[in-house]
Structure formats: structure tokens, C-alpha cells
Amino acid sequence: MPVHPYLTDEELALLNELYQQEQPESLLSLTIAIDANIRPLLEQASHLELKLALGEVKLHFPVTLKHQEASEEQAELSPPSIITDGFHPRAWRLPSPQELQLYQPNGRPLAAEIRDLSINGMRLLSRRRLFTKQQSKRVLLSLGQEQQIPLRLQLVRQHRGHHFWLTAVRFELPVAERMTLSDFVFRGFLQEISRRQPED
């Protein structure tokens, strides 16, 4: 992950409050006053988002509008897409995600360690080559708590080191599964930022 300035305690608290699914009763209300003439545009918009910039990392929170009274709208944030805005922008990768396991279609664990994970790919470390003749592989990604996401891994590249194979793969997900994985990665992002905070 590219180096970016540490967040202040207030900024970190804001991030944690913006999206708090485990405690739905703890919500941050953000009031925005806009010109009433914009309402027709909001009703026609196919996409609305809140963007947070933290150094070279950009968080894009999808916004869902819920119509209330004629002069009032209620908006809800969904898990964000996290992008590292470097020379080649790409999805932010959660390093060494914990409690994750890949399973083969027969139910056996895939003999590979997930080195990092994004919402559209991952890097795997294994003692043996994962891809031989076929360039794709079907697996189940277990997120714990009985959450499993079916994936069709597409080989990007694989490299043989002295003792291990390092394999990069990509995948695409339907909306519901993508939201689930985005939520997991975002929580990992918040934990990673918390660990990087300087101690008092």
C-alpha cells in the first residue's frame, strides 16, 4: 500500500462512524444543504457516491437515496471501493487477511495462502503450481461465520521462487457478493489504518 499521511484521531473516528454495520444503532448523521433545483437530477442519477481522499488512497462510498418528505432525502452509504491512486490506479489490497480459506469444489482446502486480497483479485502463495493447462479455477472463498463466496479465479501470472509459487489471480463478482467482499476489505482497511496510528 502506498505511504500516505497518518490520519488524525478525528479522521479515523469519522471513517469508523461512516460505516458501522456491526452496531447499526450507532449512526453518524451528516446534513447537507443543496439547491432544491438539484432534486430532479438526484432522482434521475444512475449513480451517486461520497468520495474520501486519504493521501494516495481514495474511498468511493455508493450512496442510496431514500425518499422522505418533499423537501427531505435520506441517504445511506454502502461499503466503499478503495483505490490506490498511483501511477496505475488499482483496487487497494488487504495484506495477509486473517481467517480466510479457499476451498476446492470437492470441499477440500486449496493448498495456498492468501497473501493479499482486493475486491477483484488476490495473490496466493503455494508450494506447488496452482495452474497448469487451464487458466481458470473454481473455488469457494470462506470469510468465516458461514459466509462463502464462489469465485472463478482467472490466472494473471505465476512466478516460481526458490521454495514457493506466487500466483496473481483476478475475478468478477455479482453485486451482492461484491458488496459482501467490499465490506470485509473495508473493515480490514480500518484495522490496518488503526495499526498504523502512532501511539500517544
Language model regions located:
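Structured alpha-helical
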Residues: 1-200
